[in-house]
């Protein structure tokens, strides 16, 4: 018995150690931009990644191939070098037949993007411990710089560099969003700026050492991962004239708004755009920061994030709202409701959010319903009653939450209360019932009560979550609360027909 126990412990330790080992490591990630005086930009990219485990090639299949998207109309791609260094130091150059030109996946289902190209580089000489080197340059016929470089990747990074060469008269801005999450020594982050008086040019040079692997935890806030932003002004998206006269979606919008308040109606129109206009998630730099007219996006049924945002804004304006495109990448829509600015994502059906001051937008529900009693009959006098999720209930699923966590959890604040009263068949009696309560200070509370009175079955459900963003210190109690709440999603009732 002891041998079996020791073996199990050894397996557990081995599994834990393996799980913590990264699949690969970036020895170098380097980004360099040269903003030229003639209004063009040269983007130079290089990475050197070492393969540590088969998963980097098999499970993810991303380190065995490199994909580069570009627009031949305004961009020229030059591959400088691509090769593999094997464990014994042998250099394996990539043969010409390993370079495959194809339509980018993000351009599928939208004919007006068929001119974009993707170069797929299928790496050769692959083995555990090898290092893949990729180096290429893209010459762009515009000088807009709007770079966002995530500082945490799917595997650790030993050295990350970001370099910008630009004219002394250009206004260049830079910042690290989420810098408080980096937890790095000062010696591992350096920034230098130099001036060349001979040609009136400047150089910005960031260097990061020993960047950690990005956490792989569900429901992590989108802005939690640190990002280096470098930009030379807000991108000026070129939008065709006539956007404010767009009326082609009026009939469709009249059918989807339905009942509810202003926020519900606005959200319904956004949901229609999310569901019915295909998103082609193309970096706007490949399109020269141009935006299609709402009519083009509507009639083709597809578009970039900026295209969809412009369409939704035009729809809302036509419906009488004050709305406009917003967000750093023009992928949000702002709408003014009661003098307050709310924002909607066009990428998902995420709840409408109040913009500006720190604020937990609380989803509220107070409802009394009389639904039809549709019980599933089971064996031995059991019946099953499935309870539908409450409107405003967070999408977090308890079964996907680990015992511990290292990052905050994006949930959603709510204050929900719903009573459902079912009329039971004559003579049907509930054997037992449910009365479950749980509460944690600073986190929230839940209550589920199921009891019978005469021929009525009364189901009372209440859920209150106090914070949209759950800190790590509250995670354990939050997990218990959500698990208890979702355990009542499908209720097993023992009922007996009384003669």
Predicted regions and their residues:
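A sensor for short, sequence-defined functional sites
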Residues: 20-499
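Sec-dependent N-terminal signal peptides
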Residues: 4-13, 312
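Sec/Tat signal peptide C-region and signal peptidase I cleavage site
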Residues: 15-19
